[in-house]
């Protein structure tokens, strides 16, 4: 039976989570799915566990690869996409899992029903605290990572509405392989690799369908690479912002992205200010100002160069993001004051 979708699983120090992931995977109908694991080489037992899983389930279409050196999640995603031979692919991270046994079945049925560029699913988000996982939001009722899904007709998604109301995560999306490859987009970055890809990909899509199933259980961990507060984290973010605007410009989507009537750019940046200046992040910059000064300067250079500061942060109405935008302005004032002295 021909495989219709590849389940792409980028791995990095994933051994502690693989049992949960394997259990959710084995409940799926995998007759028309291929599973591809790619381990970003590091000194742990992840690759051996993956090889053992493949051997124990040789009735399934499982492929396991390991990089020669550690290159980061972006490079691994690029390599996974290059390995795809099916019409569609779907990213899921090994520290997450499938929500229920019907996820792949619903994906395959949607693929059989019609051709599409992107298929979006619902998610369940968990906050990992101590030894317990608390459900903090059922999506897409109201958005943390996935917001409202507005349908135009039948199962077709209103593209601009979806772009405006959803955050930039590449997991839990069924992606047409030919469509994606024609975009010539690459992930590359070690962190926040989704940001430069997500917007150009969605703006370029002609048909987005809604697959009415909860696809991924997403677990927010305070010790993950993307949540750890550090200088490399913020430098990576700035690099991703730079690449995002380049990608949008190259594929002709920049005008739509910055159009004030769409309010897409404004929402993106206000939510990014939460990433930069909420709670412990704000304290990090205050306590380590001498070390983080260059990072903040680089951020402001980018915002000014691309007109973001004037378009987004000079307007009066910042909504629920007011406090974080004020913190951005606070650091701008501090930097300008020090440069005058």
Curated annotation (Swiss-Prot):
Any one GO molecular function term: hexosyltransferase activity
Catalysed transformations (reactions): a 1,2-diacyl-sn-glycerol + UDP-alpha-D-glucose = a 1,2-diacyl-3-O-(beta-D-glucopyranosyl)-sn-glycerol + UDP + H(+); a 1,2-diacyl-sn-glycerol + UDP-alpha-D-galactose = a 1,2-diacyl-3-O-(beta-D-galactosyl)-sn-glycerol + UDP + H(+); a 1,2-diacyl-3-O-(beta-D-glucopyranosyl)-sn-glycerol + UDP-alpha-D-glucose = a 1,2-diacyl-3-O-(beta-D-Glc-(1->6)-beta-D-Glc)-sn-glycerol + UDP + H(+); a 1,2-diacyl-3-O-(beta-D-galactosyl)-sn-glycerol + UDP-alpha-D-galactose = a 1,2-diacyl-3-O-[beta-D-galactosyl-(1->6)-beta-D-galactosyl]-sn-glycerol + UDP + H(+)
Reported regulation of activity: Activated by the negatively charged lipid dioleoylphosphatidylglycerol (DOPG) and inhibited by N-(n-nonyl)deoxygalactonojirimycin (C9J).
GO cellular component, one term: plasma membrane
Alphabetized CDD domains for the sequence: Glyco_tranf_GTA_type
Pfam families according to UniProt: Glycos_transf_2
Protein name per its UniProtKB record: Processive diacylglycerol beta-glycosyltransferase
């Amino acid at each position: 039976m021909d495989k219709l979708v590849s389940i792409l699983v980028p791995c990095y120090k994933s051994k502690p989570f693989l049992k949960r992931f394997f259990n959710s995977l084995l409940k799926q109908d995998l007759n028309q799915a291929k599973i591809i694991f790619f381990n970003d080489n590091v000194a742990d037992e992840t690759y051996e566990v993956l090889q053992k899983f493949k051997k124990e389930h040789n009735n399934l279409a499982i492929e396991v690869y390991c990089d020669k050196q550690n290159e980061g999640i972006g490079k691994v995603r690029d390599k996974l996409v290059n390995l795809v031979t099916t019409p569609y692919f779907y990213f899921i991270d090994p520290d997450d899992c499938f929500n229920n046994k019907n996820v792949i079945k619903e994906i395959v049925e949607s693929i059989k029903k019609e051709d599409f560029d992107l298929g979006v699913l619902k998610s369940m988000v968990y906050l990992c605290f101590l030894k317990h996982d608390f459900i903090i939001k059922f999506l897409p009722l109201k958005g943390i990572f996935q917001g409202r899904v507005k349908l135009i007709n039948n199962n077709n998604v209103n593209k601009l509405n979806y772009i405006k109301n959803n955050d930039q995560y590449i997991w839990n999306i069924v992606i047409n392989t030919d469509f994606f490859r024609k975009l010539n987009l690459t992930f590359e970055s070690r962190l926040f690799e989704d940001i430069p890809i997500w917007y150009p990909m969605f703006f370029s899509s002609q048909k987005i369908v809604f697959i009415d199933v909860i696809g991924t259980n997403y677990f927010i961990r305070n010790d993950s690479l993307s949540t750890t507060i550090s200088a490399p984290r913020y430098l990576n973010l700035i690099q991703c912002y730079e690449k995002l605007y380049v990608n949008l410009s190259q594929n002709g989507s920049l005008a739509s992205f910055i159009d004030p009537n769409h309010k897409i750019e404004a929402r993106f940046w206000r939510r990014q200010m939460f990433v930069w200046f909420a709670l412990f992040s704000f304290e990090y910059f205050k306590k380590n100002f001498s070390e983080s000064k260059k990072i903040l300067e680089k951020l402001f250079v980018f915002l000014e160069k691309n007109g973001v500061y004037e378009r987004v942060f000079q307007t009066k109405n910042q909504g629920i993001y007011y406090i974080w935008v004020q913190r951005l302005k606070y650091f701008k004032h501090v930097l300008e004051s020090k440069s005058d002295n």
